[in-house]
C-alpha cells in the first residue's frame, strides 16, 4: 500500500529528503551538506554531480532508516534552489562545468550590456524580473561563451540546460525526461510570464538555442517515473516541482490573494500571492509565478534578499564570534539593543528592492561601547530590516494591507529575531509548527497530482506554533528604520570601478 510521499529539498547548502505520511506528518528525514566553491571573488559554484550524489544518497537513506520499501511511496516532489544553472552533455549526462549558483555575480558585465541595449523595460514587463546576475539567463550565456566548444555543441543540440529541478529529474529518470515547471522557468529571465513560454527575443539577444531548454510543465502533474535502476526497480511517479520559495508559499497554505510568507534561509525570500493576475512592480520587486495547477496560473510578488542566514554563518565561520548558529540568540540577548550599530550584509550585492550588484557589506555606528553582543544582535536585526524593506514595497505594489506575516526556515526558530521582526514591521508574525514548509510544499504538490491528498486536506494540516505581536512604539520603530536606510545608502555602489 502506498502510504507516503517523499519530498526532495535540494538547497544551497544541503540536499534533504523528507518522508511524509497521509496526515502530513514528517516520518523521517535525511540530510547531507554540499560543498561551496568560490573560485574567484563573487563567484559561487556547486559540483552538479555532488548535488545529484547527495540527493540520491539521502533519498535512499530516508527509505532505509524508516524501513520503507520504494513501492510504498505514492509520489516524489522536488523543491530546489532556484536560478542555479547546470549545463550537461545530452549523451554522457555529464556537466560541462560546475553549476553556477544563484549568488554568483560574475555575469554583472553581461547585465550591464543588456541595459545598454535598452532591454531593461522589455525584460521587466515580459519576464517580471530585473536585469541581474542573480538569474539563469546570463549564467547560460557565460557558460556557452567560456567553456571550450560549448556554444558549437549547444547549436548542434548536444547540450541541455536546466535549473536544479531539471537536473534531478533527468537523473532520476536516467535521461528520459527533460522538464522544468513554471515556477522555475519564471526565475531564468528567459521566460515570458504572459505568453507562458520561452521568450524568443531574449534567447536571440543572448544567443541561447531554444533546443537546449527544458519543456515547461505545471507544478503538480506526473512528469515521469524513477528509472528501474534508481530505486530497486520501483517506478515512482515524480509529480510535483516548485522552486524552493514558491514551494514554501504553497506549504504555508498561502492559497489566497494577499497572503504572504518569508523564508529565512541562506537568503530571505518574501512572497505574496497576488492571484491570477500578474502585478508588475514599480518598487523593486519581482513578479513571478507562484504555481500552476489544473490549468490555472497563480502569480506572486517576490522580494529576494541575498544574505540572511548566511550572515549568521559569517559570524560563526569568518569572525568566530559564535560557535554555532544557535548561539546568536544567546549573545544577542546579552545586549538590550544594538546601540546604534547596523550591519548591512551586502556580501554579494543587494537584492530587492535596491538591486545593486556593486554594494558591499559594512558595519556602521561602531564606538568603544560596542562588543560582540551588539554586533551579533545587529547582524540578526539586519534580517528583519531587509524584510521591512520588502514588506513596504509589497504594500505599495499590491495596494493591500498586510495582516500577518507567516515565517519559516531555520532562523525563524530564533525568538529574539521573530519578536524584532514583528516590532520593525508593526505586524503579527506567525510561525508554524512545521517550519520545513519548503519540503512540505513540494510534497503537497506531488501528492495532489496522484490523488494522495486534495486541497481540503492541505488546509486541515496547517498548525501555528507561535505568534509574535508588535511591542515597539511607532516612533522608535521609524527612528530605527531610518538609521537602517542611512546605513544601506552608504554601502551602495562600493565595488563599482568608476
Swiss-Prot record:
It catalyses: glycerol + ATP = sn-glycerol 3-phosphate + ADP + H(+). Its EC number is 2.7.1.30. Pathway: Polyol metabolism; glycerol degradation via glycerol kinase pathway; sn-glycerol 3-phosphate from glycerol: step 1/1. ADP binds at residues 12, 16, 266, 309, 410, 414. Sn-glycerol 3-phosphate binds at residues 12, 82-83, 134, 244. One of its GO terms (biological process) is glycerol-3-phosphate metabolic process. GO terms for molecular function: ATP binding; glycerol kinase activity. ATP binds at residues 12-14, 266, 309, 313, 410. It comes from the Bacteria. Belongs to the FGGY kinase family. NCBIfam families: glycerol_kin, PRK00047.1. This is Glycerol kinase. It comes from Natranaerobius thermophilus (strain ATCC BAA-1301 / DSM 18059 / JW/NM-WN-LF). The lineage of its organism: Bacteria, Bacillati, Bacillota, Clostridia, Natranaerobiales.
Amino acid at each position: 500500500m502506498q502510504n507516503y510521499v517523499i519530498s526532495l529539498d535540494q538547497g544551497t547548502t544541503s540536499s534533504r529528503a523528507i518522508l511524509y505520511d497521509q496526515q502530513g506528518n514528517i516520518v523521517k528525514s535525511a540530510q547531507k551538506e554540499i560543498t561551496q566553491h568560490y573560485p574567484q571573488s563573487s563567484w559561487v559554484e556547486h559540483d552538479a554531480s555532488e548535488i545529484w550524489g547527495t540527493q540520491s544518497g539521502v533519498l535512499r537513506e530516508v527509505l532505509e532508516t524508516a524501513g520503507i520499501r520504494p513501492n510504498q511511496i505514492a509520489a516524489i516532489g522536488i523543491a530546489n534552489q532556484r536560478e542555479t544553472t547546470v549545463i550537461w552533455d545530452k549523451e554522457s549526462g555529464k556537466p560541462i562545468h560546475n553549476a553556477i549558483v544563484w549568488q554568483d555575480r560574475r555575469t554583472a558585465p553581461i547585465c550591464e550590456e543588456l541595459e545598454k541595449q535598452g532591454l531593461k523595460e522589455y525584460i521587466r514587463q515580459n519576464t517580471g524580473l530585473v536585469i541581474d546576475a542573480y538569474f539563469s539567463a546570463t549564467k547560460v550565456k557565460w557558460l556557452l561563451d567560456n567553456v571550450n566548444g560549448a556554444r558549437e555543441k549547444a547549436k548542434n543540440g548536444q547540450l541541455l540546460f536546466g535549473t536544479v529541478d531539471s537536473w534531478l529529474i533527468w537523473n532520476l529518470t536516467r535521461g528520459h525526461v527533460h522538464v522544468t515547471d513554471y515556477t522555475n522557468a519564471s526565475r531564468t529571465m528567459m521566460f515570458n510570464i504572459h505568453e507562458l513560454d520561452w521568450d524568443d527575443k531574449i534567447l536571440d539577444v543572448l544567443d541561447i538555442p531554444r533546443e537546449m531548454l527544458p519543456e515547461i510543465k505545471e507544478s503538480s502533474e506526473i512528469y515521469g517515473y524513477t528509472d528501474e535502476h534508481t530505486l530497486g526497480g520501483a517506478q515512482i511517479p515524480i509529480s510535483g516541482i516548485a522552486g524552493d520559495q514558491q514551494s514554501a508559499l504553497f506549504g504555508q497554505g498561502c492559497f489566497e490573494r494577499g497572503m504572504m510568507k518569508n523564508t529565512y534561509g541562506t537568503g530571505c525570500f518574501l512572497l505574496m500571492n497576488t492571484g491570477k493576475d500578474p502585478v508588475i512592480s514599480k518598487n523593486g520587486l519581482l513578479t513571478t509565478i507562484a504555481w500552476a495547477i489544473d490549468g490555472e496560473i497563480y502569480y506572486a510578488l517576490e522580494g529576494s534578499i541575498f544574505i540572511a542566514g548566511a550572515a549568521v554563518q559569517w559570524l560563526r565561520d569568518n569572525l568566530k564570534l559564535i560557535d554555532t548558529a544557535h548561539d546568536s540568540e544567546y549573545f544577542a540577548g546579552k545586549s538590550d539593543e544594538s546601540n546604534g550599530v547596523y550591519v548591512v550584509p551586502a556580501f554579494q550585492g543587494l537584492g530587492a528592492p535596491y538591486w545593486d550588484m556593486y554594494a558591499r557589506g559594512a558595519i556602521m555606528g561602531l564606538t568603544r561601547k560596542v562588543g560582540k553582543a551588539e554586533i551579533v544582535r545587529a547582524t540578526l536585526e539586519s534580517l528583519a530590516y531587509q524584510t521591512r524593506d520588502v514588506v513596504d514595497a509589497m504594500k505599495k505594489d499590491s495596494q493591500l494591507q498586510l495582516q500577518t506575516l507567516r515565517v519559516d526556515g531555520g532562523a525563524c526558530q530564533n525568538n529574539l529575531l521573530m519578536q524584532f521582526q514583528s516590532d520593525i514591521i508593526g505586524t503579527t508574525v506567525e510561525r508554524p509548527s512545521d517550519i520545513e514548509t519548503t519540503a512540505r510544499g513540494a510534497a503537497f504538490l506531488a501528492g495532489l497530482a496522484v490523488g494522495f491528498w486534495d486541497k481540503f486536506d492541505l488546509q486541515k494540516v496547517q498548525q501555528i506554533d507561535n505568534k509574535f505581536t508588535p511591542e515597539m512604539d511607532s516612533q522608535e520603530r521609524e527612528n530605527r528604520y531610518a538609521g537602517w536606510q542611512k546605513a544601506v545608502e552608504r554601502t551602495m555602489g562600493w565595488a563599482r570601478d568608476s
